[in-house]
């Protein structure tokens, strides 16, 4: 009986691994909230979606 439970548990863990659960802050949309909250609203340009500071180290200003 214990062998069958072990096999069933193994199959369940292979089919539904614990790492498949969605974690907080692992999606790109979650990180955009952090970036926009760090930028001062007086310097933010909604058209460019970036700040208008003369010296800017934001990811959107550095860009590829």
From Swiss-Prot:
First and last residue of the signal peptide: 1-20
Gene Ontology cellular component list: extracellular region
Record key words, sorted: Disulfide bond, Hydroxylation, Secreted, Signal, Toxin
Presence of the UniProt keyword Transport in the record: no
Disulfide-bonded cysteines: 50-60, 51-58, 56-61
Expression by tissue: Expressed by the venom duct.
Entry remark concerning the domains of this protein: The cysteine framework is III (CC-C-C-CC). Classified in the M-1 branch, since 1 residue stands between the fourth and the fifth cysteine residues.
Family classification: Belongs to the conotoxin M superfamily.
Protein name: Conotoxin reg3k
Species annotation: Conus regius
Highest classification ranks of the organism: Eukaryota, Metazoa, Spiralia, Lophotrochozoa, Mollusca
